[in-house]
Amino acid sequence: MPAKKTAHKRRVKKHVESGVAHIHSTFNNTLVMITDVQGNAVAWSSAGALGFKGSRKSTPFAAQMAAEAAAKSAIDQGMKHIEVSVKGPGSGRESAIRALQAAGLEITSIRDVTPVPHNGSRPPKRRRV
């Protein structure tokens, strides 16, 4: 008896004109996620997903490459205008925003949504180098 063939569903490309770019920049990595206005993911990328390993993930260049990759994928799905929300203290914040603009997306607004603790958990100890 022959094995049944399973039909793979093709991924339907969404056509969204405007959306939100969420840039999460940590000390170790930079993640760029582009969503529609409701929050459904359209495209994403990160420095680690592009092959950067270790301390190279935390560089501004890695953040720039991650933003370019996510922007290219979003532009392929018809995105033109984005709002940018940046979270975290990492070094890739500015370069990721510049890369989104250079890729051809029109930035309408930039928000900093970094969470600020009202004296929450204890921070990591100071480094002694």
Curated annotation (Swiss-Prot):
UniProt GO MF annotations: rRNA binding; structural constituent of ribosome
Listed GO biological process terms: translation
Record keywords: Ribonucleoprotein, Ribosomal protein, RNA-binding, rRNA-binding
Disulphide-bonded residues: none
Record-linked Pfam families: Ribosomal_S11
Gene3D superfamilies: Ribosomal protein S11
GO CC entries: ribonucleoprotein complex; ribosome
HAMAP family found in the cross-reference section: Ribosomal_uS11
Entry's family note: Belongs to the universal ribosomal protein uS11 family.
Function text: Located on the platform of the 30S subunit, it bridges several disparate RNA helices of the 16S rRNA. Forms part of the Shine-Dalgarno cleft in the 70S ribosome.
PANTHER family assigned: 40S RIBOSOMAL PROTEIN S14/30S RIBOSOMAL PROTEIN S11 (PTHR11759)
Subunit and interaction comment: Part of the 30S ribosomal subunit. Interacts with proteins S7 and S18. Binds to IF-3.
Protein name per UniProt: Small ribosomal subunit protein uS11
Native source species: Lactobacillus delbrueckii subsp. bulgaricus (strain ATCC 11842 / DSM 20081 / BCRC 10696 / JCM 1002 / NBRC 13953 / NCIMB 11778 / NCTC 12712 / WDCM 00102 / Lb 14)
